[in-house]
């Protein structure tokens, strides 16, 4: 029986952080190890260029870092196909064909695109590549005939646009070549979106409010000790608020079942007074290090041979290109433009 296909990936614009880990990486490893799916994981460097075209050196450097992050959290190139988007030219060709099936007005109505345009402050200077990247995403997904795409709830419009393109193509060319994917959405969106250390709604590379998977223990300690807590909890004996307190929020997310009693007692103690922020932060540091130490150790080991890391990416890209090439051949056959 053929396994369902999952496609997922990241834009290589920097090292990955705990937000990526909680939001997607942990779940990818679980799905991979269930051995129920064919998993494709890609580094979306072409998509990253849509708003980093003049900073391509960042993307080049980030490819190696993101690949190390993938390997360190447990993504296994013998179980998942890990590849680089730009090394699959068939994706760009599929994008070109799909562009003829989508109106400019439809792209401009995409809520995700509208939100991101506003966030990035493009104004009237929107790069064409950025505006059409939902079509590029559709090419990525349909090239591998992905059945499932794990994304956040904010990406639902992108999945729907891919489904529309697949439907439109199949209807226009009287075929059933393209698969309409389904999104896999987090059951608890709050757990899947980790706030920044400063209390900002989202951990972000650009805001500098994150803990990176590659951070050493001393860096993690300094970041944890600077975390946002209750600004009114000035003295240890003062009652403190746990709502909006990032230390307790992180304890809820990263604590395991065996930590539940201790965390509950700390919350009660903090709220009645007598528990200082330093003590809660030290406990959080223990919890985080339990998670990060093995990741850091594996990352350092893989980083000793970057040549091998890039050979892994090359091998994965070659395997991915074979799959995408087959889909492209079917698409061209259906369109009547396979001449030889």
Which ranges hold each PLM region?
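Alpha-helical packing segments of well-folded alpha/beta enzyme cores
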Residues: 24, 28, 62, 66, ...
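A short secondary-structure junction signal
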Residues: 109-110, 146-147, 206
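Hydrophobic alpha-helical segments
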Residues: 6, 16, 25, 159, ...
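Structured ligand/cofactor/substrate-binding pocket environments in proteins
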Residues: 16-22, 40, 54-59, 78, ...
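Short amphipathic alpha-helical segments at helix-loop
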Residues: 51, 143, 147-150, 301, ...
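N-terminal Rossmann-like or analogous alpha/beta NTP/dinucleotide-binding catalytic cores
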Residues: 2-139, 296, 300
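Conserved nucleotide- and phosphate/pyrophosphate-binding catalytic cores
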Residues: 163-340
């Amino acid at each position: 029986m053929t396994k369902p296909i999952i496609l997922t990936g990241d834009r290589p614009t920097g090292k990955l952080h705990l937000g990526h880990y909680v939001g997607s990486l942990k779940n990818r490893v679980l799905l991979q190890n269930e051995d129920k799916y064919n998993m494709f994981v890609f580094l979306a460097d072409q998509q990253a260029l849509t708003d980093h075209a003049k900073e391509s050196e960042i993307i080049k450097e980030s490819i190696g870092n993101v690949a190390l992050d993938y390997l360190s959290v447990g993504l296994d190139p013998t179980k998942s196909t890990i590849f680089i988007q730009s090394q699959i030219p068939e994706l760009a060709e599929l994008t070109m064909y799909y562009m003829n099936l989508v109106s400019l007005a439809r792209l401009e109505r995409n809520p995700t695109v509208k939100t991101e345009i506003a966030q990035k402050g493009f104004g009237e200077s929107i790069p064409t590549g950025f505006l059409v990247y939902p079509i590029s995403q559709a090419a990525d997904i349909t090239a591998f005939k992905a059945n499932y795409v794990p994304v956040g709830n904010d990406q639902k419009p992108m999945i729907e646009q891919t489904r529309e393109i697949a439907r439109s193509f199949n209807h226009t060319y009287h075929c059933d070549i393209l698969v309409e994917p389904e999104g896999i959405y987090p059951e608890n969106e709050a757990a899947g979106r980790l706030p920044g250390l400063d209390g900002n709604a989202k951990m972000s590379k650009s805001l500098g409010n994150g803990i990176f998977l590659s951070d050493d223990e001393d860096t993690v300690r300094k970041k944890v000790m600077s975390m946002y807590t209750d600004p009114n909890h000035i003295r240890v004996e003062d009652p403190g608020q746990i709502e909006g307190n990032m230390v307790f929020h992180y304890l809820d997310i990263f604590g395991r079942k065996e930590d539940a009693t201790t965390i509950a007692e700390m919350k009660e103690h903090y709220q009645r007074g007598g528990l200082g922020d330093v003590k809660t932060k030290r406990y959080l540091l223990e919890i985080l290090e339990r998670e990060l130490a093995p990741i850091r150790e594996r990352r350092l080991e893989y980083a000793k041979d970057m040549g091998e890391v890039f050979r892994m990416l090359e091998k994965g890209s070659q395997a991915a290109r074979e799959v995408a090439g087959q889909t492209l051949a079917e698409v061209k056959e259906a369109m009547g433009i396979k001449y030889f």
